[in-house]
């Protein structure tokens, strides 16, 4: 029994210490991770992310969460790049808030998902569908890094089994509020 306890304690030290997150903190972490899963970003590594991927996140995060206040119809009749626009400042703001980084504005890999006009707006075609959410069930801390584990889920369909995920983030202040900046997210295939 002593060998088991020693091995368990050693594993905890190697994997990071338990982090006593409250229920409300776990809920905030779940919402934080859901900001990425709801736009279909299941594999994130900030060391390898491109400005195109950041632009994609900034556009679609606002589509899901700030539609009425930040998304507008394209004023150009038969707009060749989609029926909606968003000001680049809102895209940059979302990227700063969730990634704690700046963006060199450019179009996404698929221009229909976000064409940058080189001036002020991203143009894109809207989309519908149910957003995949995340539920954080375990939290650990390793140095300044928070490790969140959990499962994805579909809010309107409990019968579909979600996929496990691991996310890492670093705490920081955004506009005077405590939050996190994503470092990695890996949703199992």
Where do the PLM segments sit?
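Core segments of small alpha/beta cavity-forming domains
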Residues: 21-122
């Amino acid at each position: 029994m002593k060998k088991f306890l020693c091995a368990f304690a050693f594993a905890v030290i190697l994997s990071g210490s338990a982090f006593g997150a409250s229920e409300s903190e776990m809920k905030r972490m779940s919402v934080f991770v859901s900001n990425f899963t709801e736009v279909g970003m299941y594999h994130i590594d900030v060391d390898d992310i491109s400005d195109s991927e950041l632009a994609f996140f900034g556009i679609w995060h606002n589509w899901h969460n700030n539609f009425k206040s930040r998304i507008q119809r394209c004023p150009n009749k038969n707009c060749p790049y989609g029926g909606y626009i968003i000001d680049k400042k809102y895209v940059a703001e979302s990227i700063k808030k969730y990634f704690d980084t700046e963006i060199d504005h450019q179009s996404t890999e698929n221009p229909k998902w976000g064409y940058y006009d080189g001036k002020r707006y991203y143009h894109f075609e809207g989309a519908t569908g149910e957003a995949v959410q995340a539920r954080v069930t375990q939290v650990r801390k390793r140095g300044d890094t928070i490790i969140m584990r959990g499962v994805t889920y579909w809010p309107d369909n409990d019968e579909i089994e979600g996929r496990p995920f691991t996310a890492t983030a670093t705490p920081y202040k955004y506009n005077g509020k405590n939050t996190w900046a994503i470092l990695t997210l890996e949703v199992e295939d």
